[in-house]
């Protein structure tokens, strides 16, 4: 058999086992752990290549043949970093491994059969990840949705009704009528969407009604009064309906301190938003809850990574988002109590330790909806530069750290909100919501986004050009965005109760409607690569953070990766 160099092989078929790939301009190095494509039997589409009739394509139509095959993709997922063909059928991932013609090639499984009905997409030299999941969305403006989508986010969870003051401050779609309105509005968009209802009520019936109206969970927010009673009632109802509860705790400690909140939670599972505290929560020590076994702790992206500009920009953001007035002394003091460089500095380190499990945006409400993925990788790179390789790494690579940070915006938010059966990873049986990246632009600018197995967004050149590549090249909506195709390619998530009562038919929804499940039987230990529990303390005078008795902190960066260099044009 003829042999070629690794360099030649990588240029033709992409990197193989043992090859290493740098992610963007970071210091993060991914090493290919395994190659499933079988040397000498690789698929390659094009003139004079192998993906042709009678060769790697079967002549015989069959019920197993794929709708689409992505060839020679480098998959970066919590399940591994490996090379494979990805087969897509009926909008789902049908197979991962060696694709082709099982009549002519070894190692081809039925679920990766290429036939006359199969489209091809060349994945050689590209990285494929699952679509991102942002679980902290203020639905203030619909323009957020395409912005997030272009960044690689394919699922948005949160609440709101537009630029009302309640939505500007809280991720809540309150009440049956507002939920109906937003569920219908969601029909328009290329994005999986789920809505959170108002959890601030010491009345089980009002909470239950919202869940039965289609909410996938409850959000408790201090601007509506995060009292121990509201916390207890929301969790009681959530346990009954198997939905998640997200919380923004009481910054002013009016209804109780962090210990009172934990007592009200009483060991039940809770998704805590911006657990560091700059986005809101018990001052100065809400960060303590991140180490508890029943807490699923999240960060929002304004505070990660910690930079020389982080503290300064937060004051104006906070005043606007929470309807505060700089001329009122008490409002300024409220804002000051939330912005603590010491706890922000600790947040980056807690991410690197796997104590913080999720990253999200806090869109237009102290967060940037299009930067969840970028800032997650900037944080990973900042931590590697400051602290070096993780002790868990094996070999000369950063695979463990890469899986840890990828999980924060893919599989872990999916698990937290009961949608991991459908999305959140590159696994057989899951919806084919996939993001394709050039390694040089990883984490910043996707090449292409596949939604429900169909291309929804791509970098595309001049439509009047003779080929697809002439300038200007920029993101353009593809066919999955249009007509009734968008109904097949996207999902509206609802509660099991609403699903069972036929909410799709009741509201005349045309998109796929699927129920959330297994939200209440999870703990921190279910957070992939981010399941560390610890005893966390905050010095009430200095705000320094201690984990199991040892102070944790990080330095503010004056330069980050994946930044202006990638946004020149």
From Swiss-Prot:
Gene3D superfamilies, per database record: Metal-dependent hydrolases (3.20.20.140), Urease, subunit C, domain 1 (2.30.40.10)
* Catalytic activity of the protein: urea + 2 H2O + H(+) = hydrogencarbonate + 2 NH4(+)
**What pathway is this protein said to act in by its record?**
Nitrogen metabolism; urea degradation; CO(2) and NH(3) from urea (urease route): step 1/1
Quick check: keyword Ribosomal protein in the entry? no
- One GO cellular component term, please give it: cytoplasm
Per UniProt, substrate binds at 221
User: Residues in domain Urease?
Assistant: 131-569
List the HAMAP family.
Answer: Urease_alpha
Q: Which family is it part of? A: Belongs to the metallo-dependent hydrolases superfamily. Urease alpha subunit family.
User: What is the protein name stated in its UniProt record?
Assistant: Urease subunit beta
Origin species, per record, is Helicobacter pylori (strain Shi470)
Gene designation per UniProt? ureB
């Amino acid at each position: 058999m003829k042999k070629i160099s690794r360099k030649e092989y990588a240029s033709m078929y992409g990197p193989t086992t043992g090859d290493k790939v740098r992610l963007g301009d970071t210091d993060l190095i991914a090493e290919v752990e395994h190659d499933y494509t079988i040397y000498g039997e690789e698929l390659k589409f094009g003139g004079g290549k192998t993906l042709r009739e009678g060769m790697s394509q079967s002549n015989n139509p069959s019920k197993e043949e794929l709708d689409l095959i992505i060839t020679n993709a480098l998959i970066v997922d919590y399940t591994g970093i490996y090379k494979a063909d990805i087969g897509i059928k009926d909008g789902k991932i049908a197979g991962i491994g060696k694709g082709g013609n099982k009549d002519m090639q070894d190692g081809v499984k039925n679920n990766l059969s290429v036939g006359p009905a199969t489209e091809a997409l060349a994945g050689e030299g590209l990285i494929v990840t699952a679509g991102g999941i942002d679980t902290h969305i203020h639905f203030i403006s619909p323009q957020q949705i395409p912005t997030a989508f272009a960044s690689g986010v394919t699922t948005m969870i949160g609440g709101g009704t537009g630029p009302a003051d309640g939505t500007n401050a809280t991720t809540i779609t309150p009440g049956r009528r507002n939920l109906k309105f937003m569920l219908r509005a969601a029909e328009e968009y290329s994005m999986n969407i789920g809505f959170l209802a108002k959890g601030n009520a010491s009345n089980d019936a009002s909470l239950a009604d919202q869940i039965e109206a289609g909410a996938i969970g409850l959000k408790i927010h201090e601007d509506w009064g995060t009292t121990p009673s509201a916390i207890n009632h929301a969790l009681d109802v959530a346990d009954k309906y198997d939905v998640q509860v997200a919380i923004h705790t009481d910054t002013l400690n009016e209804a109780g301190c962090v210990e009172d909140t934990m007592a009200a939670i009483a060991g039940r599972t809770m998704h805590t938003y911006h657990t560091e505290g700059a986005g809101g929560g018990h001052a100065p020590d809400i960060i303590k809850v991140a180490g508890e076994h029943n807490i699923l702790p999240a960060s929002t992206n304004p505070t990660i990574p910690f930079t020389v500009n982080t503290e300064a920009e937060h004051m104006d953001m906070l005043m606007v988002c929470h309807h505060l007035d700089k001329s009122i002394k008490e409002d300024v003091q409220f804002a000051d109590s939330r912005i603590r460089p010491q706890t922000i500095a600790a947040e980056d380190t807690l991410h690197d330790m796997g104590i913080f499990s999720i990253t999200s945006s806090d869109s237009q409400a102290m967060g940037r909806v299009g930067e969840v993925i970028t800032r997650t990788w900037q944080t990973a790179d900042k931590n590697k530069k400051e602290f070096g390789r993780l002790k868990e790494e094996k070999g000369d690579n950063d695979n463990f750290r890469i899986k840890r940070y990828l999980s924060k915006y893919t599989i872990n938010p999916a698990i937290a909100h009961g949608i991991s059966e459908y999305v959140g990873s590159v696994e057989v049986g899951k919806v084919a919501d996939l993001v394709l990246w050039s390694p040089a632009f990883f984490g910043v600018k996707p090449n292409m986004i596949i939604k429900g197995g169909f291309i929804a967004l791509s970098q595309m050149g001049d439509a009047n050009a003779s080929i697809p590549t002439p300038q200007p090249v920029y993101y353009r909506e593809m066919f999955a965005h249009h007509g009734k195709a968008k109904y097949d390619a996207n999902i509206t998530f609802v509660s099991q109760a609403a699903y069972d009562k036929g909410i799709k038919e009741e509201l005349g929804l045309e998109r796929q409607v699927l129920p959330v499940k297994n939200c209440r039987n999870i703990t921190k230990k279910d957070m992939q690569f981010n399941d560390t529990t610890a005893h966390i303390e905050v010095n009430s005078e200095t705000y320094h953070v201690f984990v199991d008795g040892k102070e944790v902190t990080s330095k503010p960066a004056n330069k980050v990766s994946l930044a202006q260099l990638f946004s020149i044009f």
